[in-house]
Amino acid sequence: AAVAGGIPAVKTLREGLAGNEMTRLAGILNGTCNYILTTMEQTGQDFADVLAEAQHLGYAEAEPSFDVDGIDAAHKLTILAAIAFGQKPDFAAALVQGIRDVSAVDFTFANQLGFRIKLVGVAAPGQVPRMQTCLLPLSSQLAKVNGVLNAVEFYGEPVGSVLAIGPGAGGGATSS
């Protein structure tokens, strides 16, 4: 699964939503990062400890930079944007920020304000794709996607919003 683990994201764009004009994509596209952020929020542990746990569980690579620096997720976003909007993939143009700088105290403040911290990618026609750490309202569908799950929210005309959620880290999800 090159994009979004166990979610058939490419097939959804090419077949399921082919009759729509896609206007935006948003998603959690790296299960490793989502696992780390979810665990930090739920346990209060710091980044390094949760990363080590993710490596032990097989969710993170021994050299995790590609994941935790947002590069893997940005590549996936760029591929989806190219398919959705009929544009040439241009990873170099994407704005990319990972999760290394998120601290345990950030979750305390986010929760007090009614938000959840997630690594989210957003793309729209004619705009620079962005993969960055975001504050999402707790009521947001993407804010409710936890653990190793990935999610892609497709926006199109006439369909509106379609959300797909599935496993995004670990051998089973990434080999499907």
Spans of model-derived segments:
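Rossmann-like NAD(P)H-binding beta-loop-alpha module
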Residues: A2-A60, I71-D72, I79
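Short coil/turn connectors at secondary-structure junctions
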Residues: G19-L25, G126-Q127, L149-N150, P158-S161
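A short glycine-threonine-serine/GTX helix/turn-capping micro-motif
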Residues: T23, E61-D69, A164-A169
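Structured core elements
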Residues: R24, I36, K118-L119, R130, ...
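A short glycine-/small-residue-rich loop at the edge of a beta-strand within enzyme catalytic domains
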Residues: G27, E41, V68, Q97, ...
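Short beta-strand segments
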Residues: G27-N30, Q132, Y155
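Substrate-binding/catalytic subdomain of NAD(P)-dependent oxidoreductase enzymes
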Residues: V50-K144, L149-A151
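ATP-dependent carboxylate/acyl-activation modules
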Residues: S139-S176
